[in-house]
């Protein structure tokens, strides 16, 4: 990317970088570190026309999060924290990520895009 003076890096963070939850401490710390790395790399790589951003989703229906969304009580509790009233599907994260990889995002760098169904608004 440096040699080509062009590139896009999109890291995957999480709402857990901003919102604490029991038993999620290490995960949240790791995601917060990814967000800081995103901002630092954005500054370091900008002279090479490389944009570095991150997408920070809320709960996404994946195998990793299955213990949370497959439990009816936990699922209901999680959905109550998301104004759009559902957990995210992988495609909900894919589209914003693809945008950040496109030429439409050429002037966006060092940003953390919250894709959380409005959860960070409350």
Located regions from the model:
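Residue(s) in the substrate-gating loop at a strand-loop-helix junction
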Residues: 14
């Amino acid at each position: 990317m440096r040699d080509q003076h062009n590139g896009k890096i999109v890291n995957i963070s999480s709402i857990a970088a901003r919102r604490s939850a029991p038993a999620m401490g290490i995960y949240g710390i790791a995601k917060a570190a990814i967000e800081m790395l995103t901002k630092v790399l954005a500054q370091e790589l900008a002279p090479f026309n490389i944009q570095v951003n991150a997408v920070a989703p809320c709960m996404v229906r994946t195998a990793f999060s299955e213990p949370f969304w497959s439990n009816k009580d936990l699922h209901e509790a999680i959905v109550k924290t998301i104004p759009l009233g559902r957990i995210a599907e992988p495609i909900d994260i894919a589209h914003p990520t693809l945008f950040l990889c496109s030429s439409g995002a050429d002037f966006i760098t060092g940003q953390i895009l919250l894709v959380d169904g409005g959860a960070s608004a409350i």
